[in-house]
């Protein structure tokens, strides 16, 4: 009996201890939470930035944001939206280093992240005049610019922008621009409702070293109308447009103005560096790149093997601008008079999105140029989502804007955009009134879109009259489509020319309607990326899967007359020798290794293929190996996946049989 009593006593004491410990930890948590809300950052010890790591990519301090059902942070109040939490700490974020928010402030950091879709607490710890490194190359630093450069008006549109971010943009413009070149700064408020952007902002800009004026839209109108208001009131020779969440680095302005002085018909863009939305670190991007648009007219960056060109002449000078088929649209400079001569903006475009597409096409097709200056670096806060809303919804606004741009400037290719862009249909062109913009195109005597593709963007991945566009189908010999295709190809006359893509295109087009009618989306298998979630610009293995409907681009390809098999976002079917480094990288990505990949398009023989209409085999031009569908084991995931490889050709092998189903892309 005594033994049992002793055991019960020990259990009771253990229970009391655990209860006391749980209460103690709960009390500590409550105190930390209260301190995070009431305590200021001014007394916090300046956190030491993480040590530098050797990597191909600059380090980035990742913040995990809550994603799930319910709102663990509570609803945002009017005070939350209107409060200005700017409390800079000397040296924080210096030289573009990341900001480390103290652990006690992490809850508050997550809560206020939602206001602007970036880490507001990190931004509010950084002084407005934080130091940045000189991101220019040695050649750019040594470059001398002529005297008598034109003056500029810097136009910044904002809507409910964070105080610290907006003012850091303005401060960087003032501190890193030669005073005699900076005519003024024009701020355009697109109907902000946050109190600190009213009288407080007006009082602040009155004492700036550069004349700064604020214009306010009477109602929420979007980027294009707001920029037009700023341009109408500008006095500088050049209009320089910046977003409200930027930081200009040393020497950013002179290269832009110098290029416009050389040619007033040039729209010149800076290199856009990355400011992290998580920790506001500043990361330099590489200079040798250019921009264009994918099949849905979304802007994309591509690494460049394009020749540097100035006024159409090739250049080996690394400081000369790079001609770019398209521009991102947020940051650029243009001669003020030329801006209006070329039709400024399409004033019927709402909010933002599509205006950069329209301007890129218009400038090139109507006699101007769009370029990127490698000597001008401006940082930009890139967000994973937008904090803004707009009547009608952003998706509807964007599709309307794209429909306007495509209808006016893309000729036959407008139908391709409307057929294969989500939210658009062929009827979209009838819903937009573009009479004035069409008249502008006629008045400026602009060139056709085919000229733009052939001369400005010859490496494009869009369909064209001399290209195949459609699906690549695996001819398993069982489906009706596979049997009909094989029968048609085997009965063709003059098969000695069968390895010429041009001949294949002609024969396929002659049976286009018949072949399209035969394809069975439930049974036929089409060539496609192995992983749907792999970025299209990175290495991705290739497989076959259920053929998708016409509106999806996952299994649609363009084939050029020289044998390049391309798909959306400038990705090409590529033969790669199995080098150890590539295999290791693919395994680290949980990828199945293969010697056939989807990779960024390049002008080399690894991406050139031939087709034999007699045997229905696709072979790599140099190695003479044929595309083959095989089962491969993913050792990391421990599962078998079907992948496309290049193997010795065997005309009897059913896994090497491929056909082409054309799809419509123009009227």
Curated annotation (Swiss-Prot):
Organism: Drosophila melanogaster
Annotated region described as Catalytic subdomain B, given as residue ranges: 321-383
Annotated ranges, domain Ricin B-type lectin: 513-661
Similarity annotation: Belongs to the glycosyltransferase 2 family. GalNAc-T subfamily.
Designated name of the protein: Polypeptide N-acetylgalactosaminyltransferase 3
Location(s) in or outside the cell: Golgi apparatus membrane
Gene Ontology terms: cellular component: Golgi apparatus; Golgi membrane; Golgi stack
Residues passing through the membrane, by range: 13-35
Pathway terms, separated by semicolons: Protein modification; protein glycosylation
Cofactor(s) needed for function: Mn(2+)
Positions that bind substrate: 190, 220, 352, 383, 388
Topological domain ranges for the Cytoplasmic compartment: 1-12
Tissues/organs with expression: Expressed in developing oocytes and egg chambers. During embryonic stages 9-11, expressed in the primordiums of the foregut, midgut and hindgut. During embryonic stages 12-13, expression is found uniquely in the posterior spiracle. During embryonic stages 14-17, expressed in the pharynx, esophagus and posterior spiracles. Expression observed in the epidermis during embryonic stages 16-17. In third instar larvae, expressed ubiquitously in wing, with increased expression in pleura and notum, eye-antennal, leg and haltere imaginal disks.
Disulfide feature: 140-375, 366-446, 526-547, 572-601, 626-649
Effect of disrupting the coding gene: Mutant larval wing disks show a decrease in thickness and in the content of O-glycoproteins specifically along the basal surface of the columnar epithelial cells. Adult mutants display blistered wings. Mutant larval shows down-regulation of synaptic O-linked glycosylation, integrin level and signaling via Ten-m and if. Synapses show smaller synaptic boutons, expanded activity-dependent postsynaptic pockets which affect synaptic plasticity and synaptic strength in both the pre-synaptic and post-synaptic assembly, no differences in neuromuscular junction morphology.
Entry EC no(s): 2.4.1.41
Gene3D superfamilies per UniProt: 2.80.10.50, Spore Coat Polysaccharide Biosynthesis Protein SpsA, Chain A
Keyword list, A-Z: Disulfide bond, Glycoprotein, Glycosyltransferase, Golgi apparatus, Lectin, Manganese, Membrane, Metal-binding, Signal-anchor, Transferase, Transmembrane, Transmembrane helix
């Amino acid at each position: 009996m005594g033994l049992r009593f002793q055991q019960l006593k020990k259990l009771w004491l253990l229970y009391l201890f655990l209860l006391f410990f749980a209460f103690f930890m709960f009390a500590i948590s409550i105190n930390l939470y209260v301190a995070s809300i009431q305590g200021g950052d001014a007394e916090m010890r300046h956190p030491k930035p993480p040590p530098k790591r050797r990597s191909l990519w600059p380090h980035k301090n990742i913040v995990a944001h809550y994603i799930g059902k319910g709102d663990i942070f509570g609803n945002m109040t009017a005070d939350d939206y209107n409060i200005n939490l700017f409390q800079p700490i000397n040296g924080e974020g210096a030289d573009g280093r990341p900001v480390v928010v103290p652990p006690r402030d992490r809850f508050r950091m997550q809560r206020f992240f939602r206001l602007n879709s970036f880490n507001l607490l990190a931004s509010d710890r950084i002084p407005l005049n934080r130091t940045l490194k000189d991101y220019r190359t040695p050649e750019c630093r040594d470059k001398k610019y002529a005297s008598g450069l034109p003056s500029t008006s810097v136009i910044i549109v904002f809507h409910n922008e964070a105080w610290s971010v907006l003012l850091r943009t303005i401060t960087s413009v003032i501190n890193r621009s030669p005073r005699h070149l900076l005519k003024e700064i024009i701020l355009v408020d697109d109907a902000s409702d946050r109190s600190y952007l009213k009288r407080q902002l007006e009082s602040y800009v009155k004492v700036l070293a550069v004349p700064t004026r604020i214009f306010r839209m009477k109602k929420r109108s979007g980027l294009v109308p707001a920029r037009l208001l700023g341009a109408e009131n500008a006095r500088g020779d050049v209009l320089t447009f910046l977003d409200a969440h930027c930081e200009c680095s040393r020497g950013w302005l002179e290269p832009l103005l110098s290029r416009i002085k050389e040619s007033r018909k040039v729209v010149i863009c800076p290199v856009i560096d990355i400011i992290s939305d998580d920790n506001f670190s500043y990361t330099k991007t590489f200079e040798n790149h250019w921009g264009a648009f994918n099949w849905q007219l979304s802007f994309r960056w591509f690494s460049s093997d394009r020749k540097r060109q100035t006024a159409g002449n090739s250049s080996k000078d690394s400081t000369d601008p790079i001609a770019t088929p398209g521009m991102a649209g947020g940051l650029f400079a243009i001669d003020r008079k030329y801006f209006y001569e070329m039709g400024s903006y399409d004033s019927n475009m709402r909010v933002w999105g599509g205006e950069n597409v329209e301007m890129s096409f218009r400038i090139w097709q109507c006699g101007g140029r769009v370029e990127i200056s490698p000597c001008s670096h401006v940082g930009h806060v890139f967000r994973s989502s937008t904090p803004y809303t707009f009547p009608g919804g952003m998706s509807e606004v964007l599709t309307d804007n794209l429909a306007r741009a495509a209808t006016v400037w893309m000729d036959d290719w407008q139908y391709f955009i409307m057929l294969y862009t989500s939210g658009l249909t062929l009827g979209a062109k009838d819903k937009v009134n573009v009479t004035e913009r069409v008249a502008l195109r006629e008045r400026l005597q602009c060139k056709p879109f085919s000229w733009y593709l052939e001369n400005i963007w010859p490496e494009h991945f869009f369909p064209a009259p001399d290209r195949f566009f459609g699906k690549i189908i695996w001819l398993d010999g069982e489906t009706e489509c596979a049997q009909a295709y094989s029968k048609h190809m085997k009965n063709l006359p003059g098969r000695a020319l069968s390895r010429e893509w041009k001949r294949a295109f002609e024969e396929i087009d002659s049976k286009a309607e018949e072949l399209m009618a035969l394809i069975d989306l439930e049974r036929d298998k089409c060539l496609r990326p192995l992983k749907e979630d792999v970025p299209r610009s990175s290495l991705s293995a290739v497989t076959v899967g259920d053929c998708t409907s016409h509106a999806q681009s996952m299994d649609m390809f363009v084939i050029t007359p020289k044998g390049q098999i391309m798909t959306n976002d400038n990705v090409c079917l590529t033969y790669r020798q199995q080098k150890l480094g590539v295999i290791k990288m693919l395994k680290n990505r949980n990828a199945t290794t293969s010697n056939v990949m989807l990779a960024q398009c390049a002008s080399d023989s690894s991406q050139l293929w031939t087709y034999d209409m007699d045997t229905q085999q696709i072979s790599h031009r140099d190695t003479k190996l044929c595309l083959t569908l095989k089962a491969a084991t993913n050792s990391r995931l421990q599962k078998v996946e079907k992948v496309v490889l290049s193997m010795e050709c065997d005309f009897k092998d059913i896994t090497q049989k491929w056909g082409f189903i054309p799809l419509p892309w123009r009227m």
